[in-house]
Design a protein with these regions (language model features):
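Core AdoMet radical
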Residues: 1-3, 18-33, 45-62, 72-97, ...
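Well-ordered, non-membrane alpha-helical segments in soluble/globular domains
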Residues: 2-11, 38-39, 63-66, 91-101, ...
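Acidic (Asp/Glu)-rich catalytic clusters
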Residues: 12-17, 41-46, 66-76, 98-107, ...
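Short, structured coil/loop segments at alpha-helix boundaries
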Residues: 34-35, 68-71, 150-155
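Conserved C-terminal portion of the radical SAM core fold
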Residues: 90-155
Length: 155
């Protein structure tokens, strides 16, 4: 990163921006891979902003670090957990994924679990719905991805 978490937080002071903002953090890949990300999140939360972090939910060490933030900050944090069901199942990471989702929920964060649908999941729909209901008490959301780099926003 070109700037420290503290510098970024200083630039994003809510007084400079006219009040608290909703800030979405989405990486070009897994958002939480950089080891510094929890500190960027922390510093922005300290400014009084609301953050939404898009993540695949698999980096337990990052969630462990974030879980140590004060609850009043965590209540301003929402995770959009991308639910890559087939890949998580193939790697045997479904338990890890749901454990991280529940950990953040128990610490006071808001969340969504969002399945990216594709034809290869048709036979698994009932299993996916039942798994989410069993683990989280509700079915996951469906998010249709679009290629924003194309004029027609292809699926």
């Amino acid at each position: 990163f070109l700037y420290t978490p503290e510098h970024v937080a200083n630039v994003f002071q809510k007084e400079r921006l006219g009040g608290p903002c909703i800030i979405n953090l989405t990486g070009g890949g897994e958002t939480l891979i950089p080891k510094e990300m929890p500190q960027y999140i922390y510093q922005l939360l300290l400014q009084g902003h609301f953050l939404e972090v898009v993540t695949n939910g698999t980096l337990t060490s990052r969630f462990d670090e974030i879980a140590e933030f004060p609850r009043n900050l965590l209540e301003h944090l929402e995770f959009k957990f991308s639910f890559h069901y087939a890949e998580l199942k193939k790697k045997g990471w479904l338990d890890r994924y749901f454990s991280n989702v529940k950990k953040m929920w128990e610490k006071g964060c808001s969340f969504t679990v969002e399945l990216m649908p594709y034809d290869g999941l048709i036979d698994d729909i009932n299993e996916i719905i039942n798994l989410c209901k069993s683990e989280l008490g509700a079915a996951c959301q469906i998010t249709v991805g679009r290629n924003d780099l194309t004029e027609k926003k292809d699926l």
